[in-house]
Amino acid sequence: MCGRYVVSRATSELLPDLLAGLPDLPDDFNVAPTTAVPVVRQRHGERELPRARWGLTPSWYPDLKKRPQPINARIETVATNGMFRRPFAQARCIVPALGYYEWVVTETGKQPHFVHQPEAALAMAGVMSAWPDPSKADDDPDKWVLSMSIITRDAHVAPGEVHDRMPACLAPDSYDDWLGDHLGTAELLELLDRDSHELAHDLTHHPVSRDANSVRNTGPQLIEPVTLG
């Protein structure tokens, strides 16, 4: 599972193959579900960086209050699940991140860990949906509310030490293939499975302050390592 992650201006510098020519990313060291976050998508052959609410709202929902609005989609079912099938086929995206948090249950409570790739950042695979706001006119630029889910897979090596699921991340050579429309379902799933499995070996994690437990706390100090007593 991926339920909290980090994005910062440094992410732009660490993902040049993905974010070159796009606006700088904001600093948010405690991104939580329902937040409108930057995502990379491709339209008319060009990459752009819109914001999408974290938690997929299908286009057929009557309003934004209807649940569920899943924050994660499983790689095993994303291409066949009724909620994700169309977004996977038509609206794939990449969610840039400096890293993400996972929690380990200890005798003294839940201990957050920051999972990241040293000297790099993560290009997490996602799917998007556009929900038509019935209160807006068709020509209103705010008519369509974008939302997204992050695709996850079974975790192994370092990420598997803190949770049994992890975000499915893409390698730079696969960005165009993932965002484009020239590959079929089987090829896309194979690409994502291969990349995410290999990239997991580059990830590491360390315990961080329990201040990260509250979404009201933010700032770069949240990802600094702490010594557990």
Feature names for model-found ranges:
Residues 1-229:
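Short linear sequence motif anchored by a di-proline
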